[in-house]
Amino acid sequence: SSFYLDTKLLRKWAKENLGGKSVLNTFAYTGSLGVACLAGGSKKVIQLDLHRKFLNVAMRSAKLNGKEVKESDYQTCDFWSRINQYKKSKKMFDCVILDPPVYSKTRKGTIDLANNYEKLINKVRPIINDGGYLITISNALFQRGDDHTSVLDKLCADGYLKIEQRIDVPDDCLGNAATIKQFLPADPSPYNHSTKITVLSVKRKSTAV
């Protein structure tokens, strides 16, 4: 599948809150979150993915939704290298969407949601404008929700990040007593599903209190 129903409410949030904003959608896959931002009136959306074939789907999706497509906004690249380039050029965004795979390894770096999600967040924080948003998504099925929350709470302790909202997976993705055959391997609470979606606000050091 290339379209994830469990992020339906996040797409709704993006459409309602990111109008006029610049957005970086990392690990974009087929770009549904970025297209939702465009549908909500975001002024600029850059979609990053390691694989061109997925970004081609993202471009087609944007066109089907009546949006102008600039190929330069769909960037086939390694996450680690591209974020370094953005930092060096001082390129900033009003919102960064961080939706990494559970595990991935390239020559430039390793993604392991169970062990280094904090590293991923700290990687993108410097390219987010003051007053902007960081949207984090973790699909680590075997990670408890309170363990994930502990990681975020630790990052928020200095006052530069703040948890604004946890976004639920819609009820129609949760199943019911007649369809659930096996319980989740780890308790996702305070989230309602193993897909753990969080909206954080960002303060720059010059303005944080």
Residue spans for each PLM region:
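SAM-dependent Rossmann-like transferase core, predominantly class I methyltransferases
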Residues: 1-21
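Conserved SAM-binding loop of SAM-dependent methyltransferases across substrates and taxa
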Residues: 30-43
